[in-house]
Swiss-Prot record:
Coiled coil stretches, renumbered: none
Protein name: tRNA(Ile)-lysidine synthase
Source organism per UniProt: Chlamydia trachomatis serovar A (strain ATCC VR-571B / DSM 19440 / HAR-13)
Annotated family: Belongs to the tRNA(Ile)-lysidine synthase family.
Keywords of this entry: ATP-binding, Cytoplasm, Ligase, Nucleotide-binding, tRNA processing
Length: 321
């Protein structure tokens, strides 16, 4: 057994010192290098957890891999849960990657509720984080939404815990190899039918080759800047959202001319106003709202199934009757 891993890592120590070690947790255990590393890391930090493995049956070897994981957990005295959903061929679905993810997270949520687990540990690492950030850049995400995955975030009311986000993949592999720990090489992670695999196998190597430098660390730095920007924007936005009132038509967000002098903040305030009503506004929609506010013209716009009324000095989300 690996008794200590990264014991001088201050970020890890800070993460684990904030956890309640009297509680029990789930570990999403795929059998790959990342989740196995995390399994031994949790043991070394005296975290009480149960491993859960989802065998989709996509590979001929997956049944044996699940059995091997069960045996390993028994050897390490780790409680183990095996889930086998109805088999689906990954080549038969256009959205199998996201569908599988949704299935896992719903399973984790159900187990946490049924068995009183306090959260789920996930093995996402620095390379995964960089992929997430680059994907969001290409998708045109707002500058305040480029922070990537969070070390702790809530899925509904269950905590998702990602302590490895600052650790590069190669360090995880090196640590396991140095202790002669075997792990699964999931070929679906290299299947370029999936976007993540194409980014991992083709895009990142190409960009690093052309750029001539490591691109992971600059992307992680961008995520850090985005997180700080998001915190600042939220602080600046809060006073404006406190002014939201209910009137005879619906929710009213008063907009003063002073705010319109800062377009970036004005559009962010409107964005958060809509989000608070579970409405996701595109950049073009926010720009349209801002343009009408600037000119003082009245407009009735549709946002999903709601009507948004833009008037001089205010935005109203009309009530549904």
């Amino acid at each position: 057994m690996i008794t200590r891993l990264f014991e001088n890592d201050k970020q890890l120590e800070g993460f684990f010192s904030s956890l309640d070690k009297k509680k029990k947790y789930l570990l999403a255990l795929s059998g790959g290098s990342d989740s196995l590393f995390l399994m031994y890391l949790l043991k070394s930090r005296a975290i009480f957890f149960t491993a859960v493995h989802v065998d989709y049956g996509w590979r001929e070897t997956s049944y044996q891999e699940a059995s091997d994981l069960a045996a390993l957990c028994e050897q390490e005295q780790i409680p183990f849960i095996l889930d086998r959903p109805e088999a689906t061929d990954p080549m038969d679905s256009r959205d199998i990657e996201n569908a599988a993810r949704r299935y896992r997270y719903e399973l984790f949520y159900r187990l946490c509720k049924e068995k009183c687990f306090s959260g789920v540990f996930l093995g996402h690492h620095a390379d995964d984080q960089a992929e997430t950030i680059l994907k969001r850049v290409f998708e045109g995400a707002h500058l305040g939404n480029l922070k990537g995955m969070s070390a702790q975030v809530m899925y509904r009311d269950v905590a998702l815990l990602r302590p490895l986000l600052h650790i590069p993949k190669h360090k995880i592999v090196e640590a396991l190899d140095s202790h002669q720990v075997q792990y699964v090489q999931d070929i679906t992670n290299c299947n370029e039918r999936f976007l993540r695999a194409r980014m991992r196998e083709r895009l990142f190597p190409y960009l690093q080759d052309v750029f001539g430098k490591n691109i992971r660390d600059p992307l992680l730095s961008l995520a850090g800047d985005s997180a700080e920007l998001r915190e600042y924007l939220d602080q600046q936005t809060a006073p404006f959202l406190l002014r939201v009132v209910d009137n005879e038509r619906g929710k009213l967000l008063p907009i003063e001319q002073e705010l319109l002098k800062t377009p970036f903040l004005a559009k962010w305030v409107c964005k958060q106003f809509f989000l608070n009503e579970r409405l996701v506004a595109s950049k073009s929609f926010l720009q349209t709202v801002y343009d009408h506010l600037m000119t003082g013209s009245t407009a009735r716009l549709r946002l999903r199934n709601r009507t948004v009324l833009v008037k001089a000095r205010g935005v109203i989300i009309e009530s549904i009757y």
